[in-house]
Amino acid sequence: MDLLIRLGFLLMCALPTPGERSSRDPKTLLSLSPRQQACVPRTKSHRPVCYNDTGDCTDADDSWKQLGEDFAHQCLQAAKKRPKTHKSRPNDRNLEGRLTCQRVRRLLPCDLDIHPSHRLLTLMNNCVCDGAVWNAFRLIERHGFFAVTLYLCCGITLLVVILALLCSITYESTGRGIRRCGS
């Protein structure tokens, strides 16, 4: 029960408050930890380049929208080179939805103040917000926190009841066997 209370507390802490930005907000999506950031490769048109160690960007006069489009293009190129063993999700009908998180993290721009284009945001939603943690958040967003907590409580209670029944059946069968042997 203590574990369930702690789990509920952690979920409450993880949920954004009404005044707080959502985890799917563009700025939040781009504000990943430095380990997840990578540099946009330098192109012939001399786009802004970031350095992983310092996070310093040069040639920042270029338009943010163009940088976002360049990043989206890099993501698509990376997706085309992905291994064929990678399974795409059933809802994905286009190449942009079948990107892997690792490829996107490798291509993320270092500058956290970038104003991304709509296409870039679509890529970020498909690539970064993927995996077990994001699926849990989506479940909470879809059904509500209390409904998900209720599902968890019911599931854990059902599991405990099943284990208790199995233990009691096992105990009764072994107890009768011991009595027979002793008589």
Curated annotation (Swiss-Prot):
Residues 20-144 are lumenal. One of its GO terms (cellular component) is membrane. It is found in: Host endoplasmic reticulum membrane. GO terms for molecular function: molecular sequestering activity. Residues 166-183 are cytoplasmic. The chain crosses the membrane at residues 145-165. Residues 30-131 form the Ig-like H-type domain. Glycans are attached at residue 52. GO terms for biological process: symbiont-mediated suppression of host antigen processing and presentation of peptide antigen via MHC class I. The keyword Signal applies. It holds the Pfam family US6. Disulfide bonds join 39-127. It is a single-pass type I membrane protein. Belongs to the cytomegalovirus US6 family. Inhibits peptide loading of MHC class I molecules by transporters associated with antigen processing (TAP). Does not prevent peptide binding to TAP, but binds to the lumenal side of the TAP complex and inhibits peptide translocation by specifically blocking ATP-binding to TAP1, but not TAP2. Also prevents the conformational rearrangement of TAP induced by peptide binding. In consequence, infected cells are masked for immune recognition by cytotoxic T-lymphocytes. The ER-lumenal domain is responsible for TAP inhibition. It is sufficient to inhibit ATP binding to TAP. This is Unique short US6 glycoprotein. The lineage of its organism: Viruses, Duplodnaviria, Heunggongvirae, Peploviricota, Herviviricetes.
